[in-house]
Amino acid sequence: ACYALITDLKRLGMLDDTLVVWGGEFGRTNYCQGKLTRENYGRDHHPRAFTTWMAGGGVKPGITYGQSDDFGYNLTDRDGNVIKPNMDHWTKDTMHVHDLNATILHLLGIDHRKLTYRYQGRDFRLTDIHGHVIKDIIT
């Protein structure tokens, strides 16, 4: 279905103006917690590594951005060294969910820093104060 959608959008000349995003807010662990049974297959939420793909709408086609270790457990740099996400320091070639949201909003023409709402006396943003637009994936 995804292939058909993208093929049709491209054929109709609509892909450049349409951003297709497929993903979730977290990955899944690659191991079991507890005994493996039919009722308990043990794959838990895993926010350290997740997969999202995007097409059209200003995204460079055919690239991969970021990577995990061989187990899909931790983020790694291009040399395979584990990266511990640091909200105070952005690391090139990694993408936090705040960066993903900032990039999607940018592709939609929205400045993520201006998308702010006040709740209980505090200003909040979807991208928190840490989001960066990842220009390496934008055409």
Per-range role (PLM):
Residues 1-139:
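Ligand-binding pockets and gating/stacking loops
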